[in-house]
């Protein structure tokens, strides 16, 4: 049996270091066993999936030095490798489960399910599908299907007993069936959920080992059932420990930048980032800290993975990157520097922004320096304003982050309109609103136009600077976040609707 592993990212945002971490361990495991590592795009979420995000994911993984033998960009014997191009496959398997008696139709509306959950919570129960679709007679199901009523297909789940499965790192794992929901397999629009598409594709693509984050442990019983229902052999499972912030919380962009592109843009070498991710819960037999991808593949053993949550510490990453930089010759370092900021389009944008402001070429350093710095040097006092309260400064930064995060098109129009709309909806004049962003992005109110600067820097560096500024002036508490989310949404409503909502 040839070992086959995969990474299956969803193209719904910026490329996450967690994706690279799981991809690295899948690739090393496959190479250790003389097997194959493939890439599949799981884009069943048609509302949030974008070609731009897919391209960023592929480019960032390639930049790191990860390679796959099959995928949407290189083809292969199991093509297509985008789930959106495989939609016709999933429905037939869902219907097969219905015919075998392992799945059923459910006609419950969203409102009915909301009421069901509310009643369960009122009784102190954990919200869970109550199996109402199982009570329908075959005649009623046939009649409602004939009438064209909206419906989903759900999988049947045992009501009693315990699901047992083996994990490469954890040994035998037990999860009571009572904790497992009757998962939707096919949605009302005919699209599959993650669980059905994942199992079908792993089987058809002959995946033998699934290395994934431990957040998928609760889903393993559903997947085991589906393999049993289809009569297929389930791949060997291995649930990797999650990357964590220094405070042991799950790695999140609120506390640490999580985009691969961010670390590339600030000057982290791909070898160093891959080296650092390789040390997340794993170590070389000789315990050395600096090693190459080839070193890791040559010495890889999955049993050396520690289940303690690995800490993603940016300071440690910076130190490791420094070791890699110090190992370069001056000529190699120059090549890396030129490659780091070699995009002519970006440099032309910077030149155009500073051109009206300089009389000597040497003055370009002062005006353009913030484009190349890791993070501007700012203090809370710099944000003090006669026009805005501290609350308005904090909210303007947080609201801008939330709104800009939803923009997949990053240009002058989208960035500019987002900020202008926010200022207008908050009732703040633009000239009073923008200094906060000049300071957050450039470290000074004397700078090139800040909206253009944000576009030139790109979303990853922009978000990092806005979040850094928010930390400086005071990030919202969990309670404030909930209240601010509601306020941010209400600001988008027409004034009469916002008033009635209040």
Curated annotation (Swiss-Prot):
Superkingdom of this protein's organism: Bacteria
Record's keyword terms, sorted: Aminoacyl-tRNA synthetase, ATP-binding, Cytoplasm, Ligase, Nucleotide-binding, Protein biosynthesis
Sequence motif: 'KMSKS' region, positions: 250-254
Broadest EC class assigned to this enzyme: ligase
This protein's GO CC annotations: cytosol
Short sequence motif named 'HIGH' region, residue ranges: 9-19
E.C. no: 6.1.1.17
Compartments, record wording: Cytoplasm
TM segment ranges: none
Keyword Flavoprotein: no
SUPFAM superfamilies with a match to the protein in the record: An anticodon-binding domain of class I aminoacyl-tRNA synthetases, Nucleotidylyl transferase
Catalytic activity: tRNA(Glu) + L-glutamate + ATP = L-glutamyl-tRNA(Glu) + AMP + diphosphate
Record-level GO BP terms: glutamyl-tRNA aminoacylation
Main location: cytoplasm
InterPro entries noted in UniProt: aa-tRNA-synth_I_cd-bd, aa-tRNA-synth_I_codon-bd_sub2, aa-tRNA-synth_I_CS, aa_tRNA-synth_I_cd-bd_sf, Glu-tRNA-ligase_bac/mito, Glu/Gln-tRNA-synth, Glu/Gln-tRNA-synth_Ib_cat-dom, GluQ/Sye
GO terms for MF: ATP binding; glutamate-tRNA ligase activity; tRNA binding; zinc ion binding
Family under the similarity heading: Belongs to the class-I aminoacyl-tRNA synthetase family. Glutamate--tRNA ligase type 1 subfamily.
Function: Catalyzes the attachment of glutamate to tRNA(Glu) in a two-step reaction: glutamate is first activated by ATP to form Glu-AMP and then transferred to the acceptor end of tRNA(Glu).
Assembly description: Monomer.
Protein name listed in UniProt: Glutamate--tRNA ligase
Taxonomic lineage: Bacteria, Pseudomonadati, Pseudomonadota, Gammaproteobacteria, Moraxellales
Gene: gltX
